Amino acid sequence: MWLGEYTWLNVFGIFLQATFIQNILLSNFLGMCSYLACSARVSTANGLGMSVALVLTVTGSINWVVHTFITGPKALTWISPSLANVNLNFLELIIFIVVIAAFTQILELLLEKVSRNLYLSLGIFLPLIAVNCAILGGVLFGITRNYPFIPMMIFSLGAGCGWWLAIVLFATIKEKLAYSDIPKNLQGMGISFITTGLIAMAFMSLTGIDISKPSAAAPTSDILETPNASSITTTNLKPVKKVRIAQQRAAKEKAINIKRGKTQ
C-alpha cells in the first residue's frame, strides 16, 4: 500500500517525470493565470512557487488517504465488509477542494505572521491557490494513476517543484526581457507565450527518460522450469525443413515427368 510494486528507482523516476518530462504547467498548461500574473519579479515568483509546491505535496498526500479510505471503490471495507458496495465517489471532488482550501487558509495565516512582505506581494493570488487548477489537477493525476502512498507523495512533490521551477525560470527571463528591444506587436502576452513555448521545448528534450514504471521480474522458479529457447526452435524447425525438402523434390520430379511426356 505504501510503496506497492515500485522500487526507489521508480520513485525517483516519478519525481523526474513530474518535474521535467510531464511538467504540470508546461505540458498540461495548468495554473497559467498565476504563472503569468505573478512572474514580474523573481522573489514573488519564488514565494508563490514554493507555496504551490507545499500545498500540492501536502494536499496530494491527504487526498490520497481520503480516496483510499473514504471515497474510492470499496474504500469503506476497513470499517465493515458490509459497506463494500457503498460508493462515495460523487463526493470526491468536493472533499478534495475542501482539503485544498483548508490547507491554503492555514498557509495564508502562517505567511501573514512569518513573512509579511511575501504575503503582501502575492496579494489576491495567495488565497486563489485554493482554486488553482494546478493543485487540483496534480491531485487528480496522481489518483487516476493509482499510485501507492509514497509514489503519490513524490509525484505531488515533483509536480509542485515543476511548477515552481517553471515560474522562477520565466520570471528570470522576464526580468531580462524588460531591458530588451522587443517588437511592439510582441510586447506583453506575445513574448510571454513565446518564452513559455521555448522553455517547454527545452523540457521536452528529456522525454526519452522513463524509469518511473515498475518492472515485474519473473520468479526464478519459472525461469528454471522453462525449457531452453534454442532447443525449442531447433526441434520445431527440423520437421519443417524436412517437409519443405520433400515438397521441393516432389515439384522437381513432377516438372521432369512433364518434360518427358512432352518429348515423347
From Swiss-Prot:
Q: Name one GO molecular function term.
A: oxidoreductase activity, acting on NAD(P)H, quinone or similar compound as acceptor
> E.C. number, please?
7.2.1.1
**Pfam family of the protein (one):** Rnf-Nqr
Q: Give the enzyme class.
A: translocase
Keywords, sorted A to Z: Cell inner membrane, Cell membrane, Ion transport, Membrane, NAD, Sodium, Sodium transport, Translocase, Transmembrane, Transmembrane helix, Transport, Ubiquinone
Q: Where in the cell is it found?
A: Cell inner membrane
* Family assignment from sequence similarity: Belongs to the NqrDE/RnfAE family.
List the membrane topology term(s): Multi-pass membrane protein
Primary location:
membrane
Name the HAMAP family on file: NqrE (MF_00429)
Q: What is this protein called?
A: Na(+)-translocating NADH-quinone reductase subunit E
Q: Where are the transmembrane segments?
A: 11-31, 50-70, 90-110, 123-143, 149-169, 189-209
Instruction: Give the UniProt entry's GO cellular component terms.
Output: Gram-negative-bacterium-type cell wall; plasma membrane
Oligomeric state and partners?
Answer: Composed of six subunits; NqrA, NqrB, NqrC, NqrD, NqrE and NqrF.
What reaction gets catalysed by this protein? a ubiquinone + n Na(+)(in) + NADH + H(+) = a ubiquinol + n Na(+)(out) + NAD(+)
**GO annotation (BP), single:** respiratory electron transport chain
The free-text function statement in the UniProt record for this protein reads: NQR complex catalyzes the reduction of ubiquinone-1 to ubiquinol by two successive reactions, coupled with the transport of Na(+) ions from the cytoplasm to the periplasm. NqrA to NqrE are probably involved in the second step, the conversion of ubisemiquinone to ubiquinol.
